[in-house]
Swiss-Prot record:
This is Formate-dependent phosphoribosylglycinamide formyltransferase. N(1)-(5-phospho-beta-D-ribosyl)glycinamide binds at residues 22-23, 82, 286, 355, 362-363. It comes from Edwardsiella ictaluri (strain 93-146). The lineage of its organism: Bacteria, Pseudomonadati, Pseudomonadota, Gammaproteobacteria, Enterobacterales. Its EC number is 6.3.1.21. Gene3D superfamilies: 3.40.50.20, ATP-grasp fold, A domain (3.30.1490.20), ATP-grasp fold, B domain (3.30.470.20). The gene is purT. Belongs to the PurK/PurT family.
Length: 392
């Protein structure tokens, strides 16, 4: 790797975050711990990572010309995408011109579109997945649902945090599911994926790091989803040695195919010793927030080390830990958090994200906890999150 310069000096090593949410905020903090100069970009002002960055910009990152102009002006050494709504074709062009995109522009483009990553996993790598079809019209959507059968799931090919996702149980659900998926889409893609139901015992996120010293795995993270978005996560998730080995093999094949240095959040379904591929993100994963207390190197620290070309070595896991989200339904531009003394019980921590607006349901923070067992840690995290009083 190249030497790291000093932030705000002529030879500074600059990192530009495309997306400045709570995950980007932690990447910014870890970057600054290594002396990097951080530039945060998002579509709204005062986003969480902007509050800790050296400087920030507000723009629509789907506008390729504007994105290119900003990057050429700031001249970052590393471009680090955190969200899906980005002009990925521009990133491909910039990378061909010599810019470094994390982990690489191809990985960002493929994974920000469910069609790209699903075809890579199922058709190129021949990994087990749920049955699926893609549709770009209501007629094609109806046909896809008929072929997959009920129950099935509809998702925009580009979305985040569960937006636009729904379950279909009968013909009455088809039209509303199509409309909901189209409304929840991000970026320029209009297609919808229809997925068949997968019966599983549990689902995991296997944080997988591709670095200068090889591929590394964090302990598997279990999580509970509701309405397509994570509500709590825990590490480690107990699973059989055979299932863990299969999960690691699948994750390794996916990240090798995507390429580049960085951390990948590989989502998998587990049924006994069987493992089925679900999705992958080429960046820190929201369920991985638990690693802020569960590991000596959080997923954010691992991501930064990896894309800088630094070795990872051994990742130490501290035992049963859990996270539970703070997810109020409010309308406010000036939220306050109360009862924190009660929330911060022994063996717990809080992260309040500092989001400047809430207009409905929005994740504003996370409670973190550890314990003698997974269930103890989960209960502590849930109790801590429930104790926080959030007022508009």
């Amino acid at each position: 790797m190249q030497p790291i310069g000093t932030a705000l000096r002529p030879h500074a090593t600059r990192v530009m975050l495309l997306g400045a949410g709570e995950l980007g905020k932690e990447v910014a903090i870890e970057s600054q711990r290594l002396g990097l100069e951080v530039i945060a970009v998002d579509r709204y002002a005062d986003a969480p990572a902007m509050q800790v960055a050296h400087r920030s910009h507000v723009m629509d990152m789907r506008d390729g010309d504007s994105l290119r102009a900003l990057i050429e002006r700031e001249r970052p050494d590393y471009i680090v995408p955190e969200i899906e709504a980005i002009a990925t074709q521009t990133l491909l062009q910039l990378e061909s011109d010599g810019q470094r995109v994390v982990p690489c522009a191809r990985a960002v483009q493929l994974t920000m579109n469910r069609e790209g990553i699903r075809r890579l996993a199922a058709e190129t790598l021949a990994l087990p997945t749920s049955p699926y079809r893609f549709a770009d019209s209501i007629e094609a959507f109806r046909q896809a649902v008929t072929e997959i059968g009920y129950p099935c799931f509809a998702k925009p090919v580009m979305s985040s945090s569960g937006k636009g996702q729904s379950i279909l149980r009968n013909d009455d659900d088809v039209a509303p599911a199509w409309q909901y998926a189209r409304q929840g889409a991000r970026g320029d893609a209009d297609s919808v994926i229809v997925e068949g139901e997968v019966r599983f015992d549990f689902e995991i996120t296997l944080l997988t790091v591709q670095a200068s010293d090889g591929i590394h795995f964090c302990a598997p993270i279990g999580h509970r989803q509701q309405e397509g978005d994570y509500r709590e996560s825990w590490q480690p998730q107990a699973m059989s040695p055979a299932a863990l080995a299969r999960a690691q093999a699948i994750a390794a094949s996916v990240v090798r195919a995507l390429g580049g240095y960085g951390l990948f959040g590989v989502e998998l379904f587990v049924r006994g010793d069987e493992v089925i591929f679900s999705e992958v993100s080429p960046r820190p994963h929201d369920t991985g927030l638990v690693t802020l207390v569960s590991q000596d190197l959080s997923e954010f620290a691992l991501h930064v080390r990896a894309f800088l070309g630094l070795p990872i070595g051994v990742i130490r896991q501290f035992g049963p830990c859990a996270s539970a989200v703070l997810l109020p339904s409010l309308h406010s531009d000036d939220v306050t958090f109360a009862n924190l003394s009660q929330a911060l019980r022994p063996a717990t921590q809080l992260r309040l994200f500092g989001k400047p607006h809430i207009d409905g349901v929005r994740r504003l923070g996370v409670a973190l906890a550890w314990g003698e067992s997974t269930e103890t840690a989960r209960q502590r995290a849930r109790d801590s999150a429930a104790s926080v009083v959030i007022r508009p």
